[in-house]
Amino acid sequence: MNENVSLYWIRQDLRLHDNPALIASVKNGSIIPIYILDDVNSDDHKIGQAGRVWLHQSLKELDKEFQNKLIFAKGNPEEILVKICQLESIKKIYWNRVYEPWVISRDKKIKTNLKKLEIETHSFNSLLLWEPWDILKDDKTNYKVFTPYFRRGCLNATEPRRPLEKPKSINYFTVKNFKSLKINELNLLPKHNWKNKIIKSWQIGEKAAITRLNNFVDTELDGYKEGRNFPHKKNVSRLSPHLHWGEISPNTVWHAVKDLNQMGIKHQQDTDIFLSEIGLSLIHI
């Protein structure tokens, strides 16, 4: 058994900065980063064609950050996680939570099965500013309308934590027995050439997401209150796909904008509206 080796299971957290599961796994010792394409349990929730193009490009960028040590697999994660843990004698798995109902149901089964095999699981929140179960009305029931949910619930709760630094160094465990797929074997890219329009139109990956945020905060947030209603204007953040795939964390975005208020920005209405819409968008991610 490799006690100081853990599996870091990548999902919608395609980044190194502000990544709680990655940071925790690195602190434990050497890691095996793995991405599993799950078209088995997703049913009607399978990733669409455009999303697959984005995912392919983002995984390519992430693999570079992981020094080409990222393991690729496709199939049922419940089976694949057990297989790699048994083949490589791993007893700890770290991941960041995803909150779609079908994913929650699948992950509960995975946790139960791994516990029977005496494999530890450690999950973290990297996708939401507040955990859903932490924001409740005074009578401990869920909010049903967004405005009171955000104004009374979220803004009166503990402020989202500040983003975490990426690991200064990562030790990788050399996988000896589990065979990784090549990224192209995930078959994420369609055969049709329309995929090239997405690739040419967007800068994809963590570095691109950070650049996009910085540009938005520096030059485009001013005037957001009015400009957000016109997609052709510069005031649209274009952060949505980066947030969806976890190339940048909501905490990073939140505090980058909040820090402007502390610097005395003139247009606080712009920042307030943007932050409320970040809260709304993350409910639907």
Task: Give, region by region, the residue ranges found by the protein language model.
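Trp/Phe/Arg-rich N-terminal binding region typifying the photolyase-homology
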Residues: 1-161
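Glycine/tryptophan-enriched, flexible segments
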Residues: 141-282
